[in-house]
Amino acid sequence: MGKITFFEDRGFQGRCYECSSDCPNLQTYFSRCNSVRVDSGCWMLYERPNYQGHQYFLRRGDYPDYQQWMGFSDSIRSCRLIPQHSGTYRMRIYERDDFRGQMSEITDDCLSLQDRFHLSEIHSLNVMEGCWVLYEMPSYRGRQYLLRPGEYRRYLDWGAANAKVGSFRRVMDFY
């Protein structure tokens, strides 16, 4: 079970809302979000309702302003609690759509896709075990995308506008 608290103002000030499960529309609870406290669990925050728009991965900790979670603005409109996973993590990445081209099987975090695999794009992937977060840039920076177990035949399937991937990591309650 997870627990996250959203605050309208920076520094954990202003009106707040506590949440312990997925919420497709947070607009009724607050108009803006400038700070967040994650008491337990790992969460994905979304800038628009129904889990749309920019995504932000947060784990246990305090985030006194939206820049701490690499936010582009104070707009958080939905959130999803990421299920805990205690087993192994496995994902296959492909250089082309529909699981074609060079394939690599992944079981751990990758700080730089370019350095490790000599790739800058992933066009399709298959998450076999665990949840992962893809980052647009190396060193876990840039736009973020939550990947749950399943097949992603093209980058549009995970919500990206292009195939550019710089890094990725397993969703774990500790780093």
UniProtKB/Swiss-Prot annotation:
SUPFAM superfamilies: gamma-Crystallin-like. GO terms for cellular component: cytoplasm; nucleus. The keyword Repeat applies. One of its GO terms (biological process) is lens fiber cell morphogenesis. Keywords: Eye lens protein, Repeat. Residues 2-40, 41-83, 89-129, 130-172 form the Beta/gamma crystallin 'Greek key' domain. SMART domains: XTALbg. One of its GO terms (molecular function) is structural constituent of eye lens. Residues 84-88 are annotated as: Connecting peptide. Has a two-domain beta-structure, folded into four very similar Greek key motifs. Belongs to the beta/gamma-crystallin family. There are six different gamma crystallins identified in rat lens. Crystallins are the dominant structural components of the vertebrate eye lens. This is Gamma-crystallin B. It comes from Rattus norvegicus.
